[in-house]
Amino acid sequence: LMIEIRSDLNKLTKDTFSRLREVIFKNVEDVLNGEGITDEEKNKLIEDVIHLLSNNKFNSELNAALYSELIIKYRLFKNSIELVKEKYDEDVTTIEAVLAHVDYERFCKNNIKNDRRKAVGLFVVYLLKRRIIEKEYVFEKIKNFVELLEKSIGEEEKKGEVEEISENIYLLLFNLKEELQNVEGYEMIIEKITTFSTLVVKEQKSFTSR
């Protein structure tokens, strides 16, 4: 059943959503209520579901919709939102740039990590829109990114990090402007970003035109 659940989650599209959601719900229920299923196996299922739903940036909106229903339907999924937050918290604090000509294998792995960070970020965006994640939590992540950006701009050889941080800030602010504009501190963050955009590239050690 766990293999079927993973397979069906990977097949989710707008066209298959209505049909597959019922199949997924039934299989999840069978696993969670099954005889002989250990707590460890149940937790592994929840972790796998979160991993698959949050790592597909092309289906973020659909996946957030499904996850929202799982939280409502199954008690064991209710606290799993903390796993989503933990995953994103870790991704936010582990941004680095790797040059392809220095270490190509690590460069490829880092690109995958960067893509995953943006995918989880977009998943978080749609969870906020569904009121599963708090505005304050997401705004705190934006503040973390902005602080990291402010620090990195003035350091040597940080252009890769600056670009990655900037892309993540844009992803959150662009998609959540309406939801966040009344949060305390929003205007101050926008002012800071506006200030960054007026900096002269050549005067900053790691500032880029992006």
Regions found by a protein language model. Name each.
Residues 1-210:
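Alpha-helical interaction scaffolds
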